[in-house]
Every structure is written in C-alpha cells, then in structure tokens.
Amino acid sequence: MASLIYRQLLTNSYTVDLSDEIQEIGSTKSQNVTINPGPFAQTGYAPVNWGPGEINDSTTVEPLLDGPYQPTTFNPPVDYWMLLAPTTPGVIVEGTNNTDRWLATILIEPNVQSENRTYTIFGIQEQLTVSNTSQDQWKFIDVVKTTANGSIGQYGPLLSSPKLYAVMKHNEKLYTYEGQTPNARTAHYSTTNYDSVNMTAFCDFYIIPRSEESKCTEYINNGLPPIQNTRNVVPLSLTARDVIHYRAQANEDIVISKTSLWKEMQYNRDITIRFKFANTIIKSGGLGYKWSEISFKPANYQYTYTRDGEEVTAHTTCSVNGVNDFSFNGGYLPTDFVVSKFEVIKENSYVYIDYWDDSQAFRNVVYVRSLAANLNSVMCTGGSYNFSLPVGQWPVLTGGAVSLHSAGVTLSTQFTDFVSLNSLRFRFRLAVEEPHFKLTRTRLDRLYGLPAADPNNGKEYYEIAGRFSLISLVPSNDDYQTPIANSVTVRQDLERQLGELREEFNALSQEIAMSQLIDLALLPLDMFSMFSGIKSTIDAAKSMATNVMKKFKKSGLANSVSTLTDSLSDAASSISRGSSIRSIGSSASAWTDVSTQITDISSSVSSVSTQTSTISRRLRLKEMATQTEGMNFDDISAAVLKTKIDKSTQISPNTIPDIVTEASEKFIPNRAYRVINNDDVFEAGIDGKFFAYKVDTFEEIPFDVQKFADLVTDSPVISAIIDFKTLKNLNDNYGITKQQAFNLLRSDPRVLREFINQDNPIIRNRIEQLIMQCRL
C-alpha cells in the first residue's frame, strides 16, 4: 500500500556514499544546531538598530477551550460557560439552587414524532411528551420547575447540528442557548442564589471564559475544531569540539600573510559574555488549578563593557537544546493541581550563546580558519515559582542548579534586510549541581537540573569571562569590508522556502477528496511514483532520491528503528544466557518496554495509561514489520503527502527531503492501535487512552495490560483508523452488523470506501479529522 514509500526509505536510507557524507558534514557543521534558535541565532533576523533586547518576563495565557472533563457534579464558577458535548439522547445536565429553581436539559434525537417518555430528573421519574420533527438536527429542551415536587414546563428549544449545548451563571441568571443552528442565540432564566447553583453533567464538557463568549457561540453553531497535538520537538545529538590553544596576547591584531588585495589577520580578544535565560509560563483555562507549559525561550541581552580601555557594545542571544520534559498530575478533576509539562535542562542538554560586538574582529568574520576559544565555567542557580491556586496552599517549584562548561565555538550569521552580522556561537555542555529542585506539597522531590520556572533567580544576567582567537581573510585595504559569500545565505533561503511550503501544505488539507484518498492509499507508492508529479524530477531522480534517503536517515522514525533493533538484539542475547525468558526480558520487552513493570502493575488509571502509552509508541514499527491487508495510518499519511505534492505549486527537489522527513514524523500525531483476540478488542493510543470491549455489543470490559502486552508481541497490530468512540457512535446511531464491525476493526479499505460513498457523516468526519492532522 501507500506506506511502502516509508518502508522503502527505511530500507535504503543507510546506503550513502562517503563523499556525500563528508559534503553533508561540511555544509551543516554550523547550521541548524539548535531546535529553537530564536530571533537572533543562525538564520533569524536581527534589528538594524540595536535596542535593549527582550525583557525577561513570564507570560500567562488563558487558553480558549479547556477540557474535555468527565461527567461530574460541582459548583462551576461564575462567568464561565460549561460547553456540553453529549453523544446519546436523554438528560445531559441538571442544576438547582434548592429553593426556587430546578433546571435540567434533555436531548432528543432527530425524527421523533410526539410521544411520551420517562426521564429521571433530580432523582424523580417524570413523564414528558417530547418530539423532534427535524430530519437531521438534534433538539435540546430546557425543563424547569420552581418547587421540588412541582410540575415541569418545557422552554427554550435549540435545534442543533453539532450536538453541543452550553450553560453559564452570570448576573443573577442562568444563561443557555436557544433557536436553531447556525443562528443559535443566548437566553436566560432569573434565579436567586445563582452563585450557589450546583451542576451535574451527564456527558463530557469543556470550560470557556465568558470573555470568549463569541467563540462559544461559534462552537455551538458550527462545532468544535479538531483537537490536535501540534508540538513536535526533536532534540539533536551534539559532540563537543576540541579546543585549540594558542600562545598569543589577549587583545591584538596580527598580520599572518599579505598580498596586493588580501591579507590574513589573526584576532585575539578578551571577551566578557553576559547572558540570561527567558521562559514562557502558560496557564490552562478553567478553574485556575492547571498549568499547561513552562518552557525556555531565547533571550536577548545588550550591554557594554571595557576592554583594554575601549568601551565595547555587545549583544548576546541565549538558547537551549535537548531539554527534558517533566510533569505532575494531581488527578483528573477540574480542581486537581496539574502541570502538564515543565522543561528542565540537565547534563544531556546544551546551552548556546551567540555573541557579537562592534569591534574590528567582527567586521570581517566571513572567511575564517583556526577558530578557538577558552572560557570560564559559570554556575546557574534556579529560584522559586509560586503556583497561585484559587484555594488551598500553593505548590512552589524551587531550587535546581547547573554549571556551564565550554564545549566549542562555531560561526553563526544574523541577517537583516540591509546588513548581515557575523557572530560567534559558543556551545556549553552542562553538569548538574546542588541544590536539587522540588515541587513542594507534591511527590516531586530531590530532582536535579535547572527548571524553566525561574532560571535567573532574580539576577539581571550571568557572566562568563574568556578569550577567543581566529584567523580571517580580509581585504588589504582596511576601508573595505569582505563581501558576504553566496553560500552563507543558502540555508536561509531554503528555510524561507520550507516555511512557505509548510503553509501551502497545511492549507491544501481542505481540498482532498476522501474517496480518491482511499484509492490512493491502496496503491503501492514507491520513490518514483511518489515524486513523479514534480517538475524536472526525472532529470534529477538519482540525486534527489539520495538526498531524501540521507535526510530520512536522521528522522525520528529511522532512529526508532535503530533503537528497536538494538533492543531486539539485547533481548535475543539475554534469552541465550538464561532459562527463563520472562524473567530476563523477552522480545516483548523490545516492543513494549514494560516487561519489567508487568509483574508490579498498579491498579491506578494513571499507571495503566503510562504503560499503554509506552507500548503504543512502539506499535507503529510493529505494524510495519507485520503488514496486514487492512489500511494503516501510514497509508493515509503517504496518500495525503502524495496528493499535496501533486497539488503544490511551490514544491521543488531542494525541499522534498525536508518535507518527506517531516511528514513521516508529524503527520497524524494522535494514533491508536488495536489487537483482536477472538471477540475481545484491546485498543490503546499514544496519548495514554485505552479501551477493551466486545465486538458484537461494543460493551467495555476491564483492560488487562499484561494480556495486551502479550498480544502485541504475538498478534498482528492494526491501526485504529475508525477508533472505538467513532465505532460506538456509529453503532448507536445507525446500527452495524458484527461482520461490518469486524471489517471496520480490521480497517478494511473496501468497507471504509462503502461508508464514504454512502456519505455516512460519522465515518466521513473521522477521516476528515485524520486528514486535518496531516500538518507540518
């Protein structure tokens, strides 16, 4: 099928000529050395007139949509919408102040003639006459009574296509929606003690601040946007360069050689590097108990200092690479304290400092050799950050320290529209130091590294003293400046092309026809057919294929294959050394990474979620190794890639290697895989969600993680193209046979095409979601 292109690249990407490898090393030695270079590093744009640089601050952002949360009973805060997303008809929410207002909302499916139904409302069986004459829209009805045992009246109907409803407490009223989508509007009911109204939700719900009411109305009328994970950070592996020592004065310019037009100058300089870290703190929406991200960001700093009686103006940019992600999850309720991710730099991380000053040494840093630097070390100690909770004692992230040690220096170039500034990039390796860091009032304690919460600890800057030496080829006439070599701008132009191409690729997702996509996903796409639509491909087929394979060799998918191969080799050698396969690690451990934890499984949901997530991240490779007749995520990914390549007006042989590699890593980030055991299905996603259910009834059963780990070792692994929630929704609304269920579980392309040709909205919506996840 279409995923043949990825398997072909994995097979052939390790055949590279030595001369090509040497050329690759030479061209990328000082390029793309950090995943987050910032606005003043390598290929960024620097200002023409230097300003004071960025102010190191923390930004708190309240996201628009917080959730989804599970059904629960709680007192929602005033001025926040509860956006309800029910999947089945019936009572979806209840709310009362226990004095004079009892309000509930019921959902009625389409095409219901007037009939009597029994609903359990506030614990009492109530007979209601309901109807919904619409053929394609669902109907929400508010049922209201003013005493606990009084009669019920029906108010404020809402006819909805997206099947969404919302309620909010504001200004001594309960606000809801009424009318008909896509023109639904707000309505309200007056109530006393409105701030004490408890809500009981019987379906998943989201929380949206009243300041974003227009967005809430947009969701009510048009539906929720696709929920996607767009963050993709791949740390690079770096090797420190040896530092070359020179016997020279600290500050001097030496003429090494001279001809009529050119001369070689050796510049030796004492330098003082001052830098600081910057961070971003993003607080989740909702009730104020959750933080989504605490991360490092590039920090610019401009300063002056005196060198041999001369005042020097300098500018630095500090960025980090190879960060470590930590998290804390206090529970799953809206009032449980959660930090989804906070970054920490440790001994496996690197710090980059780009340095430029206004001295003669940086005027002609273009053709350079014999570049070396000696720098002192510096200790960076973290401060404290208070997590300001609405109620209760505040957790505090405090402590942590690392020391920076020089690990090499390279050239970097900063571009503007008018001038090009040539800088030195100093690379520092890290060592962890005392004190350790901890998150008070939680289990996180005695951890080492420097968290991003307060990396400067109140200091204006950190300072490093040292010196550098370089030999530069410059014009003999000191009034001339060395022209910038054309090769310097190659990577910058390519990055600009890639940026424009990524925007075009993401926009093309709206133009893909699903029926054609399924047919294309079934074709065996190889290197030639994948790139046949690109102009001048045939003339440059060999060189372009080689470039694609070289780039793909460094992709996350190729690295995963290498890691898995090593794990399988270790497992095989372990088996030969002992009698008990399970006790010393079997091939199952290579696929799942949890064989050592299987015997000590916690009964908590978070433990099972972590283990299933760990297993699921390996199942993409397992599925590639044991192909089935069903369609998989990589078939869809490759088909979308082929379609976008054919439709693109900006694609070229130069950008193809980066685009193919990015597509293999970033397309469809939210994947789930399943294994089938008789009539039982086990399904797990890389996001930690897991389900076990019966094929014929879709009734959920207990999830046995040990059985799941055994099955993924011995049984075929199948991409959950149509996931469990979609299948259950399809069965509840349309009803499907057991054979149809099996075919959908096996991702049978013939059955998928039938449902799409029948214009089934549930299946089409699921495929559309997968296509929208194919973004760069």
UniProtKB/Swiss-Prot annotation:
Region spans: DGE motif: 308-310
Region: Spike foot, residue numbers: 510-776
Span of the annotated motif DGE motif: 308-310
Domain of life: Viruses
Motif KID motif mapped to chain: 644-646
Region described as Spike head: 65-224
Motif (YGL motif): 448-450
Coiled coil keyword on record: yes
GO annotation, cellular component aspect: host cell endoplasmic reticulum-Golgi intermediate compartment; host cell plasma membrane; host cell rough endoplasmic reticulum; host cytoskeleton; membrane; viral outer capsid
GO biological process terms held by the UniProt record: permeabilization of host organelle membrane involved in viral entry into host cell; virion attachment to host cell
Pfam families: Rota_VP4_MID, VP4_haemagglut, VP4_helical
Region (Hydrophobic): 389-409
Sites annotated Binding to sialic acid: R101, S190
Keywords: Capsid protein, Coiled coil, Disulfide bond, Hemagglutinin, Host cell membrane, Host cytoplasm, Host cytoskeleton, Host endoplasmic reticulum, Host membrane, Host-virus interaction, Membrane, Outer capsid protein, Viral attachment to host cell, Viral penetration into host cytoplasm, Viral penetration via permeabilization of host membrane, Virion, Virus entry into host cell
Entries under HAMAP family matching the protein: Rota_A_VP4 (MF_04132), Rota_VP4 (MF_04125)
Record's protein name: Outer capsid protein VP4
Source organism of the structure: Rotavirus A (isolate RVA/Monkey/South Africa/SA11-H96/1958/G3P5B[2])
